[in-house]
């Protein structure tokens, strides 16, 4: 604990708010995810760090929920993998991994339209995260892998991103996917990122995606539509056109900010649905594809725990910070009365402020 009384006061208040949230989320609304086959899942958590401890397991739902209520962690995780010995320290071999959920992690960075500090969030970078989820789903998961919205679980991470779980309704397909090893998962994500794109033998899906982009950039596509050997065709073009083609290809391949480690790591932890994100205080919230597609889900509105927007504090914010809008209310370093929802964001971002009496 910090020796600074003001800092201790803030930490204690934040801890109390997290406790209030979990009391409501668990006892009243049943929001908190209970990982499937709980005894075979590893649990991790963080308070002042993203992950303070892991290698924890529980035999029953009751034990797990009692522990969450007691600890009320700022960050809460479960393993994607199912393990024989989830509480053992070590890699997949020691833990006895026998299957694994497959999930994508889209984590966007500050965009060209953002005017804030790199660590902040706004409608622009959150909008970019939404767009990337739709690209992943509509350009790849639906057409290439025959999945439907019923086969996906989409989760707002509580920050600038989303987790997209593959949960096919077909039990045989689900079983097959969850048995994928590291190599299969790596091939899967590298295909989507275009890392194994072969310009001398273009597959139909990537071909269609790129031709669509070529047309937007006024690049003649007739010969690309007829041929699979694009490398030879590109090399016949003028230098300026050739450069434009390669730049377009690179731009399309870099559209998605996918965290490859989430797909690659055998013992990866992912945020627990129904918890709060310790850096923002926003909810880790499952949403529907239709609410994302129609732009009905607004992270800076629907991601805020409503009760925390009604608890007010008088504060002195001691450093200049970018504005943030939560539930339609905008706050910045000049704000002197703020809701708990904004207080959690300030705390999570290490902003220097004090709570006044």
Swiss-Prot record:
GO cellular component, as recorded: DNA-directed RNA polymerase complex; primosome complex
Cofactor: Mg(2+); Mn(2+)
Keyword Hydrolase included in the entry's annotation: no
UniProt-recorded Gene Ontology molecular function terms: DNA-directed RNA polymerase activity; metal ion binding
Enzyme class: transferase
InterPro entries the UniProt entry points to: DNA_primase_S, DNA_primase_ssu_euk/arc, DNA_primase_ssu_PriS
GO process terms (BP): DNA replication, synthesis of primer
Residue numbers annotated as active site: 105, 107, 259
Keyword vocabulary terms for this entry: DNA replication, DNA-directed RNA polymerase, Magnesium, Manganese, Metal-binding, Nucleotidyltransferase, Primosome, Transcription, Transferase
The protein's Enzyme Commission number: 2.7.7.-
Subunit and interaction comment: Heterodimer of a small subunit (PriS) and a large subunit (PriL).
Functional description taken from the UniProt entry: Catalytic subunit of DNA primase, an RNA polymerase that catalyzes the synthesis of short RNA molecules used as primers for DNA polymerase during DNA replication. The small subunit contains the primase catalytic core and has DNA synthesis activity on its own. Binding to the large subunit stabilizes and modulates the activity, increasing the rate of DNA synthesis while decreasing the length of the DNA fragments, and conferring RNA synthesis capability. The DNA polymerase activity may enable DNA primase to also catalyze primer extension after primer synthesis. May also play a role in DNA repair.
Protein family (similarity comment): Belongs to the eukaryotic-type primase small subunit family.
Protein name: DNA primase small subunit PriS
Species of the source: Methanococcus maripaludis (strain C5 / ATCC BAA-1333)
